[in-house]
C-alpha cells in the first residue's frame, strides 16, 4: 500500500515538475546544471532564485525555536546555496552580464560562513585568538593619508602627527647627537663588563 502511495506521489511530483518547467516556473522545478544553461535570461532567473532561497534560509537561521542540529543543517544549506549562486554569477559573467554582488553577512571561519544563530555554534567560535588580536591591532594603528594612501614622495609627517595625537603621545623636540667614537665605545663596553662581574660576585 505504502509502495503505491510513494509511487503515485513520485509520479505526481514528476508531473508537477514537468508542468512547471514548461511554464518556466523557476520556483517549482529542479534547477539544471549551471553549464547546461545557454540562455542568459534563463541563467539570470536561476541566479535570482538561488538568492531568494538564500534569503529564506537566512531568515530561518534567526528562528529561536530551532534546535542546534537544525541550525547546523540550515547553515550548511545556506553555504551550499551561496556557492551555487556564485557559480551562477560566474556563468553570467561569461555572457558579459554583470550584477552587483550580494552581501551575505555573518562570519567566516575556516571557509564556512555562519549566519544568525549559527554564530553561536561551537565550531563558529574557533577563530584563532592571534588572528583576532592581529585584526584589532591593525585596525587600531594603521592609518592612511587624506587621499586614502601614503604619498609617493615619502612624506609621512602628517600621518605620524595624527597618530601621536590619537594616542596621546607628545611630540618631542629633535636633538642632534654626535655618534660615539671608537674609543668611547670600547670604554663603555669595558665598564659594562666590569659592572656585570661585580654584580655576579656580589661586590
Curated annotation (Swiss-Prot):
GO CC annotations, alphabetized: cytoplasm; spliceosomal complex
InterPro entries assigned: Helix_hairpin_bin_sf, Isy1, Isy1_sf
Cross-referenced Pfam families: Isy1
Gene3D superfamilies: Helix hairpin bin (1.10.287.660)
Primary localization: cytoplasm
Compartments, record wording: Cytoplasm; Nucleus
Keywords (A to Z) from UniProt: Cytoplasm, mRNA processing, mRNA splicing, Nucleus, Spliceosome
The keyword Cell inner membrane belongs to this UniProt entry's keyword annotation: no
Coiled coil ranges: none
GO biological process: generation of catalytic spliceosome for second transesterification step
Protein role: Involved in pre-mRNA splicing.
Recorded family membership: Belongs to the ISY1 family.
Subunit structure, interactors included: Associated with the spliceosome.
The protein's name: Pre-mRNA-splicing factor ISY1
